[in-house]
Each structure stands twice: as structure tokens, then as C-alpha cells.
Design a protein with these regions (language model features):
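N-terminal cysteine/histidine-rich coordination modules
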Residues: 154, 158, 162-163, 167-199
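Short helix-coil boundary/hinge micro-motifs
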Residues: 1-152, 159-160, 198-199
């Protein structure tokens, strides 16, 4: 459970927004910044997820209805579960099913760009647009290989989503100096206790 945020690797570019989305619930402290529809609306607005590229975001925040609020929380849980699978290389089928179900409700389009790239772009309005951005960023990260580096800390009392920037992609903890160190100390203590037991 790292308390030093500077030790936690932020995901690069737009994937950082998805990382923040996954970390909007803090397992260590038991806090959730997306407790209400108003919280979700404010969170999306802070990250400009209610607007398209080149558009100015309206001053009035779109309302997030009950159905969209439920979808946001389901999406966060499912994406956290999928990120957890990045250590093993296999995502939980129920999490994938949830993301697919939500994605089917969000209108999207493939956009071709002048630099010979394609982008998945959400077309909806309000919460639908914001959910679409989370999905589009995740889609892009999965296709570029960046998603596989977004993981949940192996410390069960932490579970922070971190970006594994290690060369060999074997990062396990959000911070080696806290969660990783604690795990190593526990393992050492268990080995010492095992040696101290009479035969």
C-alpha cells in the first residue's frame, strides 16, 4: 500500500486517464471518489471526457443518470479485473463480457488520420461520450501493447493500478520501495519462522 505517489509509475499519454479511472477506488483506504452520479460527472468533466477533440467543453456539466452511473462502476470493476489479468496474460471472462456489453451500448466510429493511423472515436453525448472515451483509450492501448503494462499491485492491501515501465515487463508492485519491500520482508520472516521450528 504505497503512500508515496511519486513512487508509482503513471501510465503515459491518454492511458493515464484510464489508470486514474481504475484508481478512483482506493482499496487501501476504502475510499471511492465516484460515490454518486454528481461525483462521476465532476470526475469526467475534470478530465474533459464530455468533449470531442477541438471542441470546448460546456460549462454546465451533463447529468449522469442512474443507468449510466451503474455502467461506469461496472466498467471500472471490469477493467480493474482485466488489468489484474495482465500479470497472467488471461483476463477474467466475466470482466471481458461486461466490457463488451457496455461497449455495445456506446456509439463509436473509426476515424482515419493524416498520419496513416486510425482512431476509435466515441460519438455519443454526455456520460455515453465519456464512457466511450474510456473504452476508446483502452482499445488503443490494447492494440499498441501498452495495456498489458497496466497492472494491479500484487499487494492485497493495495491493488493500485500502476504502469509497468520495466524493460522486461515483470513489475509486480506499484512501488518497490513500499509494497515490494513489505512483501520481501514478509517472505523473509516466514522463511525465518520456518527455520526456527523444531524438527
Amino acid at each position: 500500500m504505497s503512500t508515496d505517489l511519486s513512487q508509482r509509475a503513471p501510465a503515459p499519454g491518454a492511458l493515464g486517464v484510464v489508470q486514474q479511472f481504475l484508481n478512483s477506488v482506493d482499496i487501501a483506504s476504502g475510499t471511492d471518489v465516484l460515490r454518486t452520479s454528481a461525483d462521476v460527472s465532476a470526475w469526467f468533466a475534470e478530465r474533459r471526457l464530455f468533449s470531442r477533440p477541438g471542441e470546448q467543453q460546456a460549462d454546465a456539466l451533463p447529468e449522469v443518470g442512474d443507468a449510466d452511473f451503474g455502467r461506469v462502476l461496472q466498467l471500472r470493476t471490469a477493467l480493474r479485473d482485466i488489468a489484474e489479468g495482465n500479470l497472467t496474460g488471461r483476463a477474467a471472462p466475466s470482466a471481458v463480457e461486461t466490457v463488451n456489453r457496455i461497449a455495445a451500448l456506446v456509439p463509436m466510429a473509426v476515424r482515419f488520420d493524416t498520419d496513416n493511423t486510425t482512431l476509435l472515436t466515441p460519438l455519443g453525448e454526455g456520460a455515453e461520450l465519456a464512457i466511450g472515451w474510456i473504452l476508446a483509450i483502452t482499445f488503443d492501448a490494447m492494440n499498441t501493447g501498452m495495456w498489458q503494462r497496466l497492472r494491479l499491485c500484487a499487494a492485497t492491501d493495495c491493488r493500485f493500478a500502476f504502469y509497468d515501465a520495466s524493460r522486461n515487463r515483470t513489475g509486480t508492485w506499484c512501488s518497490m520501495s513500499t509494497c515490494g519491500n513489505r512483501a520481501k520482508v514478509r517472505a523473509y520472516q516466514q522463511r525465518q519462522r520456518g527455520r526456527a521450528l523444531p524438527a
